[in-house]
């Protein structure tokens, strides 16, 4: 056991060295990115030893080294939990980050601040590992906030672009809403359990109140971009492609799902929270799949596929299967990072063109990238014996076996079919047919720093699911016999989506352009949610705030009370004074008229 904990500590410690190097010697040399990449590669190799030991021993461990603070009731300490989740996730995250770092050497080669970029990526990874290995809520909150602030810095990396700055602010604001739920849960457990250690929380709060569980659900919805708090996820595509790959594969977006997995024992006996999680995940996975169907930006299609898969993970937690959700996190990381890297390769070679309508015919000019993109898309769709199949098929089988909401199961199956459809659409428009990009475009994919990481992730997308499911034993499995038609449900809807997309492509490639229906606009404009939330509601608020000062300040004070009131007093005084007509002479003359008339009559 000592060897096991020592090896794990040895895995995490070298990651801090590149950051310490920048503190000692701020003038980093050109070799710094290669140094960071080598550190992560060696750390991944070291991490395989404690993971292998965990597979053999199947024994959890907790490392508590340093006490931060002690109050009368609570003791905070630096504590790492080495269990099934953390020991499986660490090598997966390191492997994916290693590939992304090497890809960044090619993609960010001309960036003047590439050293700072690699430092940010490394801190991003470290904060995620802190979150995964934390054994108390406060330490987990440090990692939680760490991935949030690093996502802000990385999304706004190209800070001269207004869209990048807006997307970064949007990401941090939506995550702030989730953080409110997390802090609420922190406060509740401190007051009622007097502890932030998961073991004591589970023992002392076997059936906690609805308040902290709703807080955790809100936190997960914000961080993992569930429906209502989802707009920041496609907007985050304004950052560099390596950032998108790391953000969507093994760091920030899975942090919310991981939070629910880690504290699932608190919620497993609460049917209301389970139902809310299930329905939220089901609606999210369908909505994201519908939006991905009509997107034309290649990175946004992959981003919405991430949102759809996160919804599927929430569905899995909602049917009381956190280990299956974690398995999908691990398998999803490989092909999602690869899809983003293939997209980045295509975008870079086509002079920053992201519109799939202006691509086509890349299968011959970029064979390795195209092959990897096809493998990643098929793995995403859940094609048999690719990495995504081992988790996705199992999730739908388990959903079929469980006593769950049939409505949620139905829309999850529809979303699975749509996943296959938009993956096929992306392949057809990007790789097949005639080239639709300028003829003078210089396409070159011969750089080994581009090809090697894509090759490694392609191998992971082919075999990682088989390796993980056969070597890392699940904690609890329910062996049940189900009919053949239920067993083949996931495969059937996947092939249905594939065939539908192929058929539509064959039927519509020679049709004249018509005005698209309203359903197209709903999908293409993301259900009008950004327009309503980011345009209409702020406009109404601005209009109201504009009218109030105009009516209260300008109209009331500056017009009604002062000028018009003074004018009214002046009119009253004028009326009073104007009753005296100034005709005294005429009045005196009128006295003379009777006298003159009398004299005339007498005479």
UniProtKB/Swiss-Prot annotation:
<keyword id="KW-1278">Translocase</keyword>
<feature type="transmembrane region" description="Helical">
    <location>
        <begin position="171"/>
        <end position="191"/>
    </location>
</feature>
<comment type="function">
    <text>Core subunit of the mitochondrial membrane respiratory chain NADH dehydrogenase (Complex I) which catalyzes electron transfer from NADH through the respiratory chain, using ubiquinone as an electron acceptor. Essential for the catalytic activity and assembly of complex I.</text>
</comment>
<feature type="transmembrane region" description="Helical">
    <location>
        <begin position="272"/>
        <end position="292"/>
    </location>
</feature>
<feature type="transmembrane region" description="Helical">
    <location>
        <begin position="122"/>
        <end position="142"/>
    </location>
</feature>
<feature type="transmembrane region" description="Helical">
    <location>
        <begin position="482"/>
        <end position="502"/>
    </location>
</feature>
<dbReference type="GO" id="GO:0006120">
    <property type="term" value="P:mitochondrial electron transport, NADH to ubiquinone"/>
</dbReference>
<feature type="transmembrane region" description="Helical">
    <location>
        <begin position="241"/>
        <end position="261"/>
    </location>
</feature>
<dbReference type="InterPro" id="IPR001750">
    <property type="entry name" value="ND/Mrp_TM"/>
</dbReference>
<feature type="transmembrane region" description="Helical">
    <location>
        <begin position="87"/>
        <end position="107"/>
    </location>
</feature>
<keyword id="KW-0679">Respiratory chain</keyword>
<dbReference type="GO" id="GO:0032981">
    <property type="term" value="P:mitochondrial respiratory chain complex I assembly"/>
</dbReference>
<feature type="transmembrane region" description="Helical">
    <location>
        <begin position="301"/>
        <end position="320"/>
    </location>
</feature>
<dbReference type="GO" id="GO:0005743">
    <property type="term" value="C:mitochondrial inner membrane"/>
</dbReference>
<feature type="transmembrane region" description="Helical">
    <location>
        <begin position="325"/>
        <end position="347"/>
    </location>
</feature>
<feature type="transmembrane region" description="Helical">
    <location>
        <begin position="583"/>
        <end position="603"/>
    </location>
</feature>
<comment type="subunit">
    <text>Core subunit of respiratory chain NADH dehydrogenase (Complex I) which is composed of 45 different subunits.</text>
</comment>
<dbReference type="GO" id="GO:0008137">
    <property type="term" value="F:NADH dehydrogenase (ubiquinone) activity"/>
</dbReference>
<feature type="transmembrane region" description="Helical">
    <location>
        <begin position="144"/>
        <end position="160"/>
    </location>
</feature>
<dbReference type="GO" id="GO:0015990">
    <property type="term" value="P:electron transport coupled proton transport"/>
</dbReference>
<protein>
    <recommendedName>
        <fullName>NADH-ubiquinone oxidoreductase chain 5</fullName>
        <ecNumber>7.1.1.2</ecNumber>
    </recommendedName>
</protein>
<comment type="similarity">
    <text>Belongs to the complex I subunit 5 family.</text>
</comment>
<dbReference type="InterPro" id="IPR003945">
    <property type="entry name" value="NU5C-like"/>
</dbReference>
<dbReference type="InterPro" id="IPR001516">
    <property type="entry name" value="Proton_antipo_N"/>
</dbReference>
<dbReference type="InterPro" id="IPR018393">
    <property type="entry name" value="NADHpl_OxRdtase_5_subgr"/>
</dbReference>
<dbReference type="GO" id="GO:0045271">
    <property type="term" value="C:respiratory chain complex I"/>
</dbReference>
<dbReference type="InterPro" id="IPR010934">
    <property type="entry name" value="NADH_DH_su5_C"/>
</dbReference>
<keyword id="KW-0249">Electron transport</keyword>
<dbReference type="Pfam" id="PF06455">
    <property type="entry name" value="NADH5_C"/>
</dbReference>
<keyword id="KW-0813">Transport</keyword>
<dbReference type="Pfam" id="PF00662">
    <property type="entry name" value="Proton_antipo_N"/>
</dbReference>
<keyword id="KW-0520">NAD</keyword>
<keyword id="KW-0999">Mitochondrion inner membrane</keyword>
<feature type="transmembrane region" description="Helical">
    <location>
        <begin position="407"/>
        <end position="429"/>
    </location>
</feature>
<dbReference type="Pfam" id="PF00361">
    <property type="entry name" value="Proton_antipo_M"/>
</dbReference>
<feature type="transmembrane region" description="Helical">
    <location>
        <begin position="38"/>
        <end position="58"/>
    </location>
</feature>
<keyword id="KW-1133">Transmembrane helix</keyword>
<keyword id="KW-0812">Transmembrane</keyword>
<feature type="transmembrane region" description="Helical">
    <location>
        <begin position="211"/>
        <end position="233"/>
    </location>
</feature>
<feature type="transmembrane region" description="Helical">
    <location>
        <begin position="370"/>
        <end position="390"/>
    </location>
</feature>
<keyword id="KW-0496">Mitochondrion</keyword>
<keyword id="KW-0472">Membrane</keyword>
């Amino acid at each position: 056991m000592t060897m096991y904990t020592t090896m794990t500590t040895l895995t995490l410690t070298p990651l801090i060295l590149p950051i310490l190097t920048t503190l000692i010697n701020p003038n980093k040399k050109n070799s710094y990115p290669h140094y960071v990449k080598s550190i992560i590669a060696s750390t991944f190799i070291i991490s395989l030893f404690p993971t292998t030991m965990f597979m053999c021993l199947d024994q959890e461990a907790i490392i508590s080294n340093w006490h931060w603070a002690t109050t009368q009731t609570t003791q905070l300490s630096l504590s790492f939990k080495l269990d099934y989740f953390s020991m499986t996730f660490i090598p997966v995250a390191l492997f994916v980050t290693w590939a992304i770092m090497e890809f960044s050497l090619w993609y960010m080669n001309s960036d003047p601040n590439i050293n700072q970029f690699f430092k940010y990526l490394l801190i991003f990874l470290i904060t995620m590992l802190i979150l995964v290995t934390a054994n108390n809520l406060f330490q987990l909150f440090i990692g939680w906030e760490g991935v949030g602030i690093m996502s802000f810095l990385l999304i706004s990396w190209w800070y001269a672009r207004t869209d990048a700055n807006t997307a970064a602010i949007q990401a941090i604001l939506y995550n702030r809403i989730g953080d409110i739920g997390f802090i609420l849960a922190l406060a509740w457990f401190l007051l009622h359990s007097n502890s932030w250690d998961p073991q004591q929380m589970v023992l002392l709060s076997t059936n906690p109140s609805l308040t902290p569980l709703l807080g955790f659900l809100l936190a997960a919805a914000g961080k993992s971009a569930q429906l209502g708090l989802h707009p920041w996820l496609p907007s985050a595509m304004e950052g560099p492609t390596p950032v998108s790959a790391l953000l969507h594969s093994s760091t920030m977006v899975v942090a919310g799902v991981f939070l629910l997995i880690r504290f699932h024992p608190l919620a497993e006996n609460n049917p209301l929270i389970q139902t809310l999680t299930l329905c939220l995940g089901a609606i999210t996975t369908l909505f994201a799949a519908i939006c991905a169907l009509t997107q034309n930006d290649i990175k946004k299609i992959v981003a919405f596929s991430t949102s759809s898969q996160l919804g599927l993970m929430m569905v899995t937690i909602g049917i009381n299967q956190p280990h299956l959700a974690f398995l999908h996190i691990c398998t999803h990381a490989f092909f999602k990072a690869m899809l983003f890297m293939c997209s980045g390769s295509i975008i870079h070679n086509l002079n920053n063109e992201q519109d799939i309508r202006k691509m086509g015919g890349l299968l011959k000019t970029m064979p390795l990238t195209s092959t990897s993109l096809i493998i990643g898309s098929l793995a995403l769709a859940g094609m048999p014996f690719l990495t995504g199949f081992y988790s996705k098929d199992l999730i739908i089988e388990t959903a079929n076996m469980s006593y769950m909401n049939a409505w949620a199961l139905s829309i999850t199956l529809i979303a699975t079919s749509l996943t296959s459809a938009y993956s096929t659409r992306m392949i057809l428009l990007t790789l097949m047919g005639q080239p639709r990009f300028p003829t003078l475009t210089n396409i070159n994919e011969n750089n080994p720093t581009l090809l090697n990481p894509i090759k490694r992730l392609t191998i992971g997308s082919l075999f990682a699911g088989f390796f993980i499911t056969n070597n890392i034993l699940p904690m609890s499995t329910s062996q049940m016999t189900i009919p053949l038609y239920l067993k083949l449900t996931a495969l059937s809807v996947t092939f249905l989506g594939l065939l539908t997309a192929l058929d539509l492509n064959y039927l519509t490639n020679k049709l004249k352009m018509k005005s698209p229906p309203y359903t197209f606009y709903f999908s293409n404009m993301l259900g009008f949610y950004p327009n309503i939330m980011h345009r209409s509601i702020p406009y109404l608020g601005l209009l109201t705030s504009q009218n109030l000062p105009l009516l209260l300040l300008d109209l009331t004070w500056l017009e009604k009370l002062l000028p018009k009131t003074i004018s009214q007093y002046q009119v009253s005084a004028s009326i009073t004074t104007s009753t005296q007509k100034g005709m005294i002479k005429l009045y005196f003359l009128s006295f003379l008229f009777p006298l003159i008339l009398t004299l005339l009559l007498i005479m």
